Amino acid sequence: MSSTLSVAKAASTPVKQITSAVGPVKESPGNWKHPRLAEITRRQSRNIFGEKNVRQIVYNVAAIVLLEIFRVFASPSIPSQLILPSLRPYSLWIHAVFLVIPLTNIVIALLPLFRPVDDLSDIPLTPAQRKLLGLPPSSKPATPNSVYSTPPRYSRTPSLAGSPASIKSYTSSTLPTASSPTPGAAGIGAGSPAAPIYLSPSKFTTSTSSQQFSPSPSGASPLLHRAISNTSTASGVSPYGSPNSPSKFGASTNSTLAASTISTSTFSVSTTSSIAHVLNNSRLRESVIEGVPATPTPVGKGASVKANSKWLYQRGRRTSSNNWVY
């Protein structure tokens, strides 16, 4: 029999022990309350005449009215056989007891209007606590053995939120400067015309001056190659000068015959370089106005432009006359 009971106990479902997950509440300035706050609230509510008191008075007055209606209209119609003969002499006393109960409740509900105000002088409260509770300052001096209950105090660490150092560091870390590039200026293209442009004068100088015309064997026109080759064959001078002393146009400046022969081709070269220079400057100006980075086109790859300007023609003649001086 005992073995059967032990097997039944082992087969029974174990009961899960429910442990309280809420630990003891530590006192802190955020959740602290006065240890005698419940007593203070109860004693203060005794002097408050509110909605609860009014409701209590109304209900008890209604009960008195119903008792009087029952006594006047219902008691004569009750047969005397239903009332015990021993209770007939006490019928008036029974009616009076039923009337005393609602009258007592009405008097209790009216007591806050006549009860003196409790100043809670027997409870040790600081002046700040009395002010928060709406109590007048205590007229009695504090007893030597009174212990005031106050919230725990913690040392406050100074905040650097409004200090000049924090404002300075925030300004230096967030505001962009003129030297630091902005995200909008990192990649400027045709798809973003409203992006700001950061260009220095040195970039303009480099882009315009680096595209000077230099008649090299790969970039010059075939007519220039032919003119230089014929001149060098007739004078016996290398068409592009010696490696140690290269000249501007590829011919030696000491040879008068080479200079006179090249003067014919110089006009076309100078005219082409002037046109390319004017085109580069106009494209650079348009690119700065439109917000697109300048991409000057080299002379050898530029579009062919008909030079019909009188100014370009006169400039070419002056260049050719200067070459004849040498």
UniProtKB/Swiss-Prot annotation:
<keyword id="KW-0653">Protein transport</keyword>
<keyword id="KW-0813">Transport</keyword>
<keyword id="KW-0539">Nucleus</keyword>
<protein>
    <recommendedName>
        <fullName>Nucleoporin POM34</fullName>
    </recommendedName>
</protein>
<keyword id="KW-0906">Nuclear pore complex</keyword>
<dbReference type="GO" id="GO:0030474">
    <property type="term" value="P:spindle pole body duplication"/>
</dbReference>
<feature type="compositionally biased region" description="Polar residues">
    <location>
        <begin position="232"/>
        <end position="247"/>
    </location>
</feature>
<feature type="compositionally biased region" description="Low complexity">
    <location>
        <begin position="171"/>
        <end position="187"/>
    </location>
</feature>
<dbReference type="GO" id="GO:0006606">
    <property type="term" value="P:protein import into nucleus"/>
</dbReference>
<feature type="compositionally biased region" description="Polar residues">
    <location>
        <begin position="156"/>
        <end position="170"/>
    </location>
</feature>
<feature type="transmembrane region" description="Helical">
    <location>
        <begin position="57"/>
        <end position="77"/>
    </location>
</feature>
<comment type="function">
    <text>Functions as a component of the nuclear pore complex (NPC). NPC components, collectively referred to as nucleoporins (NUPs), can play the role of both NPC structural components and of docking or interaction partners for transiently associated nuclear transport factors.</text>
</comment>
<dbReference type="Pfam" id="PF08058">
    <property type="entry name" value="NPCC"/>
</dbReference>
<dbReference type="GO" id="GO:0051028">
    <property type="term" value="P:mRNA transport"/>
</dbReference>
<dbReference type="InterPro" id="IPR012578">
    <property type="entry name" value="Nucl_pore_cmplx"/>
</dbReference>
<dbReference type="GO" id="GO:0005640">
    <property type="term" value="C:nuclear outer membrane"/>
</dbReference>
<dbReference type="GO" id="GO:0070762">
    <property type="term" value="C:nuclear pore transmembrane ring"/>
</dbReference>
<feature type="region of interest" description="Disordered">
    <location>
        <begin position="134"/>
        <end position="187"/>
    </location>
</feature>
<keyword id="KW-0812">Transmembrane</keyword>
<keyword id="KW-0811">Translocation</keyword>
<comment type="subunit">
    <text>Component of the nuclear pore complex (NPC). NPC constitutes the exclusive means of nucleocytoplasmic transport. NPCs allow the passive diffusion of ions and small molecules and the active, nuclear transport receptor-mediated bidirectional transport of macromolecules such as proteins, RNAs, ribonucleoparticles (RNPs), and ribosomal subunits across the nuclear envelope. Due to its 8-fold rotational symmetry, all subunits are present with 8 copies or multiples thereof.</text>
</comment>
<keyword id="KW-0472">Membrane</keyword>
<keyword id="KW-1133">Transmembrane helix</keyword>
<keyword id="KW-0509">mRNA transport</keyword>
<feature type="transmembrane region" description="Helical">
    <location>
        <begin position="94"/>
        <end position="114"/>
    </location>
</feature>
<feature type="region of interest" description="Disordered">
    <location>
        <begin position="232"/>
        <end position="253"/>
    </location>
</feature>
<feature type="compositionally biased region" description="Polar residues">
    <location>
        <begin position="140"/>
        <end position="149"/>
    </location>
</feature>
